[in-house]
């Protein structure tokens, strides 16, 4: 059985400022760097053999910190990028017009082929995330990879593994530097294919995540 760990990047400056990131980027805060070190301490005990990350800066930095703890190299895979939020990227969430908020809601509420202008649909996101995950099946026997990605992207992946629509990711709370795990199994009695073992574990973090403080 292949075990794959899924980690959301550490807190960023734009997370703190409530700006829409998408495939734009901002650096980790000092708290985000600390979160990544704490993931590294947990990952050191898990026997991680490969660290594969979105090629955006915030995930790369998170992956580099984890890799230092695990003694692994980092492999970049653009398929693990966040949802492309088009013309709304870099915008403060509270600055959106009614029309712009409508675009965002169409996307996250599951309107068929809903997308922000110049952005990506949830279906497109789901397809590339599943392709990236499937690549883990090609790793040598005994591998235990850890993927570093983004909140909406990972939520979409976990939701669709569970048989839910991609937009159900809004019902999952995957905080910064949370750890999830999915397993690939073949069984005559249980579900074959990908199954979700854990989602959104933050027991390794020693301080509340920002979205806990903003509730």
From Swiss-Prot:
<dbReference type="InterPro" id="IPR023086">
    <property type="entry name" value="Phosphoglycerate_mutase_GpmB"/>
</dbReference>
<dbReference type="GO" id="GO:0005737">
    <property type="term" value="C:cytoplasm"/>
</dbReference>
<comment type="similarity">
    <text>Belongs to the phosphoglycerate mutase family. GpmB subfamily.</text>
</comment>
<protein>
    <recommendedName>
        <fullName>Probable phosphoglycerate mutase GpmB</fullName>
        <ecNumber>5.4.2.-</ecNumber>
    </recommendedName>
</protein>
<dbReference type="GO" id="GO:0004619">
    <property type="term" value="F:phosphoglycerate mutase activity"/>
</dbReference>
<dbReference type="InterPro" id="IPR013078">
    <property type="entry name" value="His_Pase_superF_clade-1"/>
</dbReference>
<dbReference type="Pfam" id="PF00300">
    <property type="entry name" value="His_Phos_1"/>
</dbReference>
<dbReference type="GO" id="GO:0016791">
    <property type="term" value="F:phosphatase activity"/>
</dbReference>
<feature type="binding site">
    <location>
        <begin position="104"/>
        <end position="105"/>
    </location>
    <ligand>
        <name>substrate</name>
    </ligand>
</feature>
<dbReference type="InterPro" id="IPR029033">
    <property type="entry name" value="His_PPase_superfam"/>
</dbReference>
<feature type="site" description="Transition state stabilizer">
    <location>
        <position position="150"/>
    </location>
</feature>
<feature type="binding site">
    <location>
        <begin position="21"/>
        <end position="22"/>
    </location>
    <ligand>
        <name>substrate</name>
    </ligand>
</feature>
<dbReference type="InterPro" id="IPR001345">
    <property type="entry name" value="PG/BPGM_mutase_AS"/>
</dbReference>
<feature type="binding site">
    <location>
        <position position="60"/>
    </location>
    <ligand>
        <name>substrate</name>
    </ligand>
</feature>
<feature type="binding site">
    <location>
        <begin position="151"/>
        <end position="152"/>
    </location>
    <ligand>
        <name>substrate</name>
    </ligand>
</feature>
<feature type="binding site">
    <location>
        <position position="58"/>
    </location>
    <ligand>
        <name>substrate</name>
    </ligand>
</feature>
<feature type="binding site">
    <location>
        <begin position="82"/>
        <end position="85"/>
    </location>
    <ligand>
        <name>substrate</name>
    </ligand>
</feature>
<feature type="binding site">
    <location>
        <begin position="8"/>
        <end position="15"/>
    </location>
    <ligand>
        <name>substrate</name>
    </ligand>
</feature>
<feature type="active site" description="Proton donor/acceptor">
    <location>
        <position position="82"/>
    </location>
</feature>
<keyword id="KW-0324">Glycolysis</keyword>
<dbReference type="InterPro" id="IPR050275">
    <property type="entry name" value="PGM_Phosphatase"/>
</dbReference>
<feature type="active site" description="Tele-phosphohistidine intermediate">
    <location>
        <position position="9"/>
    </location>
</feature>
<dbReference type="GO" id="GO:0006096">
    <property type="term" value="P:glycolytic process"/>
</dbReference>
<keyword id="KW-0413">Isomerase</keyword>
<comment type="pathway">
    <text>Carbohydrate degradation; glycolysis; pyruvate from D-glyceraldehyde 3-phosphate: step 3/5.</text>
</comment>
């Amino acid at each position: 059985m292949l075990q794959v760990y899924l980690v959301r990047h550490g807190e960023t400056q734009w997370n703190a400022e409530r700006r829409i990131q998408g495939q734009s980027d901002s650096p980790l805060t000092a708290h985000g760097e600390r979160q990544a070190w704490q993931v590294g301490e947990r990952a050191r005990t898990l026997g991680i053999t490969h660290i594969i990350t979105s090629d955006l800066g915030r995930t790369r930095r998170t992956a580099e910190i984890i890799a230092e703890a695990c003694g692994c190299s980092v492999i970049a895979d653009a398929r693990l990028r966040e949802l492309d939020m088009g013309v709304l990227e870099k915008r403060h969430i509270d600055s959106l017009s009614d029309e712009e908020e409508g675009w965002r809601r169409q996307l996250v509420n599951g309107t068929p082929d809903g997308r922000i202008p110049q952005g990506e649909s949830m279906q497109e996101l789901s397809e590339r995330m599943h392709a990236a995950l499937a690549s883990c099946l090609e790793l040598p026997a005994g591998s235990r990879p850890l993927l570093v990605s983004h909140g909406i992207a990972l939520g979409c992946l976990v939701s669709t593994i569970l048989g839910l629509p991609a937009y159900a990711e809004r019902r999952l709370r995957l905080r910064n530097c949370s750890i999830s795990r999915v397993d690939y199994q073949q069984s005559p009695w249980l579900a074959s294919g990908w199954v979700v073992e854990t989602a959104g574990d933050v027991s390794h973090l020693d301080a509340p995540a920002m979205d806990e403080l903003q509730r």
